[in-house]
Regions:
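Signature of extracytoplasmic/envelope-associated structural regions
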Residues: 1-315
């Protein structure tokens, strides 16, 4: 009877700076495709050759995505840092290798870079973070019983402490927002892979083993944005008014924004926080209950983005 790889058995390991981090996940996906080019094989003497030939010598960047819980302990903070931080004093993002292991097989994804991070902030649901990205190469590493995932294994906390009932607060343009329905925050890292195809390399390709794979990239742009959805109540607010509700259908090109999502307060706070300056627009939503959404985008350019976004953990 054949053995199978089951998603529910999948475990994710990040290898970064020689260390191995086991990341608990609720979902994971990964893939890589190859570019196929066709060419005509029809000739004057073979008019029935109407099916084109094929050339495959180039791999597209691999893709991956996984979701992990934003617990109160520091077990998974490395993933957050890989999303946010630069590589040293450069403007490049950090790269890492990813291993996905089932009870049967192990798969390896090389030179990974996180291109998107979606902060899952919902009332009555534990905080979590979904990251997705691109990579150089996906390959089969081997049978689990035959291979060893590299890296110095990092210890884990004895118990997992979840942010099970996060308290969400938001201040926009120095006004505390009430009647919040939900909050969405997303960080996008726009990268572009350097050209990696040459005529010489193309002529040498004989299989997926020596195909042309992307190797390096540049960071083109970063966008931190989100929305704060609230119920429309009797307190509408007016433009320029010092109330706790901003005006409907208003906007601003420069306003301070502070969002926190987590448990505890002061030095005991554990969770996500966002503190910077943004532009925003306000739009009305006409569902069964009327809502308004403040759609915002960061306009600051800090030396370190971690001064704007933080994931606070601790005992």
């Amino acid at each position: 009877m054949p053995s199978f790889n089951f998603l529910k058995e999948a475990k994710v390991y990040i290898i970064y700076s020689g260390n191995q981090y086991n990341i608990d996940i609720s979902s994971v996906s990964f893939s890589q495709t190859f570019t196929e080019n066709s060419y005509s094989v029809k000739t004057l003497h073979n008019q029935k050759n109407v099916f084109d030939g094929s050339i495959i010598n180039k791999a597209n960047p691999a893709n991956f995505e996984f979701t992990f819980p934003a617990i109160k302990d520091s077990d998974f903070v490395t993933v957050f840092n890989l999303l946010v931080d630069y590589e040293g004093f450069t403007n490049k993002l950090n790269t890492f290798d990813l291993y996905i292991s089932t009870e049967l097989d192990v798969f390896k994804i090389e030179t990974c870079v996180i291109t998107n991070g979606s902060f899952v902030i919902e009332k009555s649901r534990p905080l979590s973070l979904t990251v997705s990205g691109e990579a150089s190469k996906l390959s089969y590493f081997g049978a689990k019983s035959d291979v060893t995932i590299p890296g110095s294994v990092q210890s884990r906390s004895a118990t997992m402490r979840y942010n099970t009932n996060p308290v969400v607060t938001a201040t926009l343009d120095s006004q505390a927002l009430s009647n919040i329905v939900n909050v969405a925050v997303e960080l996008q890292n726009d990268i572009e892979w350097n050209p990696y195809t040459t005529v010489h390399q193309a002529l040498q390709v004989t299989s997926a083993n020596n195909a042309m794979y992307p190797t390096d990239f540049v960071l083109k742009n970063r966008v931190l944005s989100g929305s704060i959805q609230r119920y429309v109540t009797e307190r509408k607010g007016t433009i320029g008014a010092s109330s706790n509700a901003l005006a409907l259908q208003s906007w601003d090109t420069s306003a301070p924004i502070v969002i926190t999502a987590g448990e505890g307060s002061g030095g005991s706070f554990r969770g996500f926080s966002f503190d910077g300056n943004c532009s925003f627009t306000n739009r009305l939503g006409t569902g069964s209950v009327f809502t308004q959404s403040h759609d915002w985008r960061l306009i600051d350019n800090p030396t370190n983005l971690s001064s704007i976004i933080s994931y606070t953990t601790g005992a």
